[in-house]
Amino acid sequence: MAAKVASGTNKVFQNHDDVHISFEDQQRINRFAKHNARMDDFKAELETKRNELKSLEEALEEIELFDEDEDIPFLVGEVFLSHKLEKTQDMLKETKEQVLKEIAGVEAKAKVIKAEMDELKAHLYQRFGSNISLEAED
């Protein structure tokens, strides 16, 4: 690191254009970048799951209007199976509960990653100050 001593004093001024990056610092930067990419994946997955949840809730509302003895097609894998109203409602509720669990799981993973990212960000900003930018580019 380049340092300059002010004349007549013992103060040291550092030239911020010449910052030494240690191997450990590079590892932290790389880990932060990986976590940032994972967070983007989690955001996309959460959006997909929330849209799926919304569709399930709308389907539950719509089938309320059907007759009890009418067959209602329900998508299982790649095929539609027809069931009576009550059975279809039960299947939709089970699917909704599963999607809610999946959303909670993704949110929990994202929370852990976010905590580690915050820790890395604090360390890297302390070390490099304004010479590094770790903010998302939205």
Curated annotation (Swiss-Prot):
GO cellular component: cytoplasm; prefoldin complex
GO biological process terms, semicolon-separated: protein folding
UniProt GO MF annotations: unfolded protein binding
Keywords annotated in UniProt: Chaperone
Chaperone keyword on record: yes
SUPFAM superfamilies: Prefoldin
Domain of life: Eukaryota
Stated role: Binds specifically to cytosolic chaperonin (c-CPN) and transfers target proteins to it. Binds to nascent polypeptide chain and promotes folding in an environment in which there are many competing pathways for nonnative proteins.
Family: Belongs to the prefoldin subunit beta family.
Name this polypeptide is given: Probable prefoldin subunit 4
Protein's organism: Drosophila melanogaster (Fruit fly)
Gene symbol of the encoding locus: Pfdn4
